[in-house]
Amino acid sequence: MGLGAAYKEGFRYILDKLDSELIVQMDADHSHQPSEIPNMLEKIKNFDYLIASRHVEGSDIVGWGIGRKATHSVAGVIAKACAKIEINDSTSGFRMFKKKTLERIDFDKIRSDGFAFQIEVLYQLKQLGMKGLEVPTVFVNRTEGSSKMGSSEMMQFITMCISYIGRK
């Protein structure tokens, strides 16, 4: 099961079974800091969703070399242009949603089962007129395991970008 498929299943479960007004999404590899959630709780009041961004003032990325940072930045610029979204860190896995926001996403329309899933969600949120905010985060690269980013992920990203060309 890819990342996007896991998110779809998890979000559907949460929306069906749990009674919570806010949902926090974060990676399980300790790269996101749970200590940042209280700040996010304060900031979401006037927004539909938040992105803990590695690309806003006050953010930091620990454990990435210059090459990884550059690749990530370029991919972010491409995603932003293709999907016509305002978010700078479109692949951040640290997010907070109001439940009513997640309920409006049509997960069946999302084709990507990898990292591009994150961008497709943002595209739908933009189409729905949802209001988002990026907040600074300290991202700590995992100390164990390895990135799942590979040729399959890159192909999904390229396919997604091409599919958005010509859309509003």
Functional labels for PLM-detected ranges:
Residues M1-D16, L22, P34-F115, R142-F157:
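Acceptor/aglycone-binding surface of glycosyltransferases and processive sugar-polymer synthases
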Residues G10, D29, K98, L125, ...:
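Residue-level signature of catalytic and energy-coupling elements of molecular machines
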Residues S20-D29:
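Short beta-strand-to-loop acidic/aromatic patch adjacent to the donor-nucleotide binding site
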Residues Q25, I51-S53, V135-T137:
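Short glycine/serine/threonine-enriched helix-capping/active-site loop
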Residues A28-S31, N141:
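Acidic, glycine-rich active-site loops and adjacent beta-strand->loop/helix elements
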Residues I85-E86, K109-D113, L122-V138:
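Catalytic donor-sugar/metal-binding loop of nucleotide-sugar-dependent glycosyltransferases
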Residues I119:
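DNA-recognition element of transcription regulators
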Residues L128-K168:
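C-terminal catalytic/acceptor-binding lobe
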